[in-house]
Amino acid sequence: MKKSVKQEQVTQMHDKLLRAKAVFLADFRGMNVDKATTLRNELRSASVEYKVFKNTLFDIAAKETEAACLAPYLAGPTAVAISYDDPVGAAKVLSKFAKDSKGVFVLKAGVLSGKVIDVNQIQALADLPSREVLIAKMLGSMQAPATNFVGVLAALPGSLVRALDAIRAKKEGN
């Protein structure tokens, strides 16, 4: 491969890493084309870019990005999954695929918000509810006090009416 082509690839990868919210590395040793295609399609549907990239070129491209801390994990055949939107969605797809592939596809590490995350942390990230579910839960918990307050306000006139009715009934009974 010509040096100019390599430089162009490094520049493109560097730009992608700068835009990434999360980057994951995986060992794909022994994975056949059908499985790789399946994984690419699943990742694409989760807005994740999956690429096999030469380790030395990735190391150069990662300099001055949050992914620079992944250098120790660049050994053997390495695939890169770059998430631009939802790191949880990417972690879910990668973790499920790693579990289903039984050792053919193995997660190495990732970087999220500038911090290296290991396989266990990637799995913990995958176990989180989706972004939409978390937002719905947060909105529900924010809305609950207002709903309770409205319920109390609605109950006050009813309580007053019942108290007045009880007083009226008591006076009529005397």
UniProtKB/Swiss-Prot annotation:
- What is a GO molecular function of this protein? structural constituent of ribosome
* UniProt keyword RNA-binding, yes or no: yes
Q: What does this protein do?
A: Forms part of the ribosomal stalk, playing a central role in the interaction of the ribosome with GTP-bound translation factors.
Q: Which UniProt keywords apply?
A: Ribonucleoprotein, Ribosomal protein, RNA-binding, rRNA-binding
Enumerate the NCBIfam families for this protein.
Answer: PRK00099.1-1 (NF000955)
Supply one GO CC term from the record: large ribosomal subunit
Q: Which GO terms describe its biological process?
A: translation
* Alphabetized InterPro entries for the sequence: Ribosomal_uL10, Ribosomal_uL10-like_sf, Ribosomal_uL10_bac, Ribosomal_uL10_bac_type, Ribosomal_uL10_CS_bac
**Subunit (UniProt):** Part of the ribosomal stalk of the 50S ribosomal subunit. The N-terminus interacts with L11 and the large rRNA to form the base of the stalk. The C-terminus forms an elongated spine to which L12 dimers bind in a sequential fashion forming a multimeric L10(L12)X complex.
Signal peptide range in chain numbering:
none
State the similarity comment: Belongs to the universal ribosomal protein uL10 family.
Q: Please identify the protein, giving its name as recorded.
A: Large ribosomal subunit protein uL10
